[in-house]
């Protein structure tokens, strides 16, 4: 008996191998899934007969779910229902259990239920998933009358009337979207359960079956539920997703449903995508994938809405006229007749203008969505060059209301891509990294959504400065249009900011915008990264940095637009990207630039600035009862750079801590003055190893360094400041943890023995799939006798500790560091000098570069 099962198991293995070979040779996926279902039928029937369950009228074997629909994927579960009469004996039930055991023994992943018709019907009346799978049942073997009785007992006359079933399935989909629509699932989408995935197709078939009593979705054409073209589109989406899913199962060797990063690479290779100069094979594959799920989701939304309007609420219409072309039906906008778009194609855009102008409109009627999709061909060259069209499109952004929902719909219905060729190119474009969580088109719309949120009271507490600025903004439409074009050229190769600026220039000319408005929009697109790069890579406390930044702003008002776009852009790139530290950096840069641009502060020389900050700090300390002479004696040992970098409040706090200290090192952990991070302040006799010790200890405590300022005083004491964040990129809240770090730093900095070992930590699963080539560039800063080292590499635990050890080995002195992490990519800036205090020469740079690359490659664990 066991030998028979072994033979069957081997037969199944060989058959699946043959199917995989056929699939690899581009066999039709529908044929393959059906062949597999039919083959499994023969195995199950054979085992059913072997266990003598086919005699008489006591048992019935049914295939359910995708297996019942004859759509079996390579490693999908095989859903079975064994119905039996009330009078079966225990021996017969044991045979049924033995049948299931045989299924498992031959390697079939079987999910099963052994029950009576009445029990099954009772369960179906209470469980949505049960009634849904029953609707797909297919008779394999046994007494068919049992199946017919189950069909009768689960009919809409007895349970789950179509409207109740519809709303339950709709809620189920909303719950699924909430679960699988998160960022992680966007980077590594679930092909079965994710938004736009196969479940979105199955719900359309389910509600059609329940209401129209049809067996296939194609039969819904005759009921007006779906058009021929829409059916063909859905069929295309289904076949694409089936092919990807079959290949995923084949490559994984198991029922894998998630397109994780490693499988994305393998799938792109399997389907024949090849890297191009400006776009990776994986990005091409995922672009096609995202386009398909976007189309699938769009059709799902439209057809479910059609069902709701036509079947559920068909007798409850309240009509309100808007104009000659549009009206509201139960708060949903619709055309007043089906010739509107043909007679006046500009009305396609006008509909979306109404959506922005009237925020009380809840959506677009399904019949009108269908008409929009059928009318997209009218949006040709003549349409796009029309001045009337241009005015309507610009007015969408000029109403003063939130345009996000209207633009989101324009994107879903294909209107934006038909109106803007450059947007069509960007649609579905994904970047293969952990930094960008969304496709370019979705990210763009999220940035626009974020701008609109700055105006809303519920976001004023989270973004107070943005809320203040945007209320005084003269022309918000400029900001919206800058956002629309800021990433429009991603995926083409070259500098997307420059290419996007060209697109923006052409757009503003075609839309008859005023010269000054056009100039600002183009500038925003070209320089949309300026503020974030300045804040994260440069010393924003240095007046020269502020002066250089301001010189790139043609007018003071440009700063307001740029700040708002920068915040909206960061928040719309990845939900984990924005934190209090980035917030504080951008605010400080904004305020410093604002002061300089409005001439409230003339460009002072360093000596004057130092004098002002010293005086403010002195006033604070004297008010605390500290002698001015004691303060001046201490300050006389500090470098001028320290007073430029720190605010008067921080200078006073550091000074007080040093003067109150009874021993060295002085280590203080406290909130940074901006409250965006946690500050680690260290004052101690000079020690070359201190940077290495500090980075090693902090790495072992799983904190990340955002900034470091390293200063050796004239009295040969070191005065170092670090800004750190916890694992969640937030300032520390745990006082005990801060005390533990403080104690460890004190112990190791005071110790003259070995350097602290850096604890080894594994890379996260996601990080292991990315390989950022280590790049090192040097720029000499002759004014300060320093060399700027710009490092790009893979993020990994303990990276900064590794770098610090290289600096120590080669006698490289660090003066300042700016640390920036974007997903798997680290972009760090170090201001360094050699052991004599000067910029590195060519030989020193070469040795440092080679040593860093070697040690970084060894530290990837």
From Swiss-Prot:
Q: Do you know which PROSITE patterns this protein is assigned to?
A: ACT, HD
Tell me the segments the record calls region Uridylyl-removing. Answer: 322-678
The Swiss-Prot or TrEMBL record lists the needed cofactor(s) as: Mg(2+)
EC number(s) stated in the UniProt entry for this protein: 2.7.7.59, 3.1.4.-
Q: How is its activity regulated?
A: Uridylyltransferase (UTase) activity is inhibited by glutamine, while glutamine activates uridylyl-removing (UR) activity.
Q: Which CDD domains match?
A: ACT_ACR-UUR-like_2, ACT_UUR-like_1, HDc, NT_GlnE_GlnD_like
Stretches assigned to the ACT domain: 679-760, 788-861
Keyword Membrane: yes or no?
no
Q: Could you tell me the superkingdom of the organism this chain comes from?
A: Bacteria
Uridylyltransferase as annotated region, ranges = 1-321
| GO MF annotation, one | [protein-PII] uridylyltransferase activity
Pfam hit, one? HD
Is Transferase tagged as a keyword? yes
Q: What reaction does this enzyme carry out catalytically? A: [protein-PII]-L-tyrosine + UTP = [protein-PII]-uridylyl-L-tyrosine + diphosphate; [protein-PII]-uridylyl-L-tyrosine + H2O = [protein-PII]-L-tyrosine + UMP + H(+)
- Keywords assigned by UniProt? Hydrolase, Magnesium, Multifunctional enzyme, Nucleotidyltransferase, Repeat, Transferase
Q: Which GO terms describe its biological process?
A: regulation of nitrogen utilization
Matches recorded under InterPro entries: ACT-like_dom_sf (IPR045865), ACT_dom (IPR002912), GlnD_Uridyltrans_N (IPR005105), HD/PDEase_dom (IPR003607), HD_domain (IPR006674), NT_sf (IPR043519), PII_UdlTrfase/GS_AdlTrfase (IPR013546), UTase/UR (IPR010043)
Checking NCBIfam families in the record gives: UTase_glnD
Q: What is known of its domains?
A: Has four distinct domains: an N-terminal nucleotidyltransferase (NT) domain responsible for UTase activity, a central HD domain that encodes UR activity, and two C-terminal ACT domains that seem to have a role in glutamine sensing.
Q: What does this protein do?
A: Modifies, by uridylylation and deuridylylation, the PII regulatory proteins (GlnB and homologs), in response to the nitrogen status of the cell that GlnD senses through the glutamine level. Under low glutamine levels, catalyzes the conversion of the PII proteins and UTP to PII-UMP and PPi, while under higher glutamine levels, GlnD hydrolyzes PII-UMP to PII and UMP (deuridylylation). Thus, controls uridylylation state and activity of the PII proteins, and plays an important role in the regulation of nitrogen assimilation and metabolism.
The family database entries (HAMAP family) matched by this protein are listed as: PII_uridylyl_transf
As for family, the record states: Belongs to the GlnD family.
User: What is the designated name of this protein?
Assistant: Bifunctional uridylyltransferase/uridylyl-removing enzyme
* Gene this chain is encoded by: glnD
